[in-house]
């Protein structure tokens, strides 16, 4: 896992890029299509090193960040997200999702690591938009 200071640095000074994304809120069941697509896109990115999706942060068009803390009781367990991804993407993508406290409140961090088995693609159809065999890249 990366240190809090690294997360705060990303929030304060980095913009969204091929290996960093900000999401205002957690992925709820009705947004699992986006979760699958976002994790796959990051994993298929050829840039070396860890990739991160930081949840509870919105980047504005001018690059500023707005914080939307996650209530501790609303925090989604990593096992829920891992199950959705494992059931729908092949080969398996290693990632973690964990809470981090910053001065403004609790945020969530997806950390995607150990990516070496490209390409990652849909194992089966999911919802109306994701079809078996599709592959996304960020």
Regions found by a protein language model. Name each.
Residues 1-138:
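Conserved N-terminal catalytic/coupling substructures associated with nucleotide/phosphate chemistry
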């Amino acid at each position: 896992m990366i240190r809090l200071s690294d997360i705060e640095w990303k929030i304060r000074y980095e913009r969204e890029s091929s290996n960093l994304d900000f999401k205002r809120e957690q992925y709820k069941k009705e947004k699992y299509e986006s979760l699958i697509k976002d994790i796959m896109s990051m994993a298929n990115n050829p840039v070396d090193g860890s990739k991160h999706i930081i949840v509870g942060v919105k980047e504005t068009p001018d690059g500023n960040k707005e914080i939307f803390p996650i209530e501790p009781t609303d925090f989604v367990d990593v096992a829920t997200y891992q199950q959705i991804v494992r059931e729908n993407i092949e080969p398996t993508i290693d990632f973690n999702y964990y809470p981090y406290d910053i001065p403004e409140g609790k945020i969530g961090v997806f950390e995607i690591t150990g990516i070496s088995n490209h390409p990652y693609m849909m194992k089966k159809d999911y919802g109306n938009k994701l079809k078996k065999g599709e592959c996304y890249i960020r």
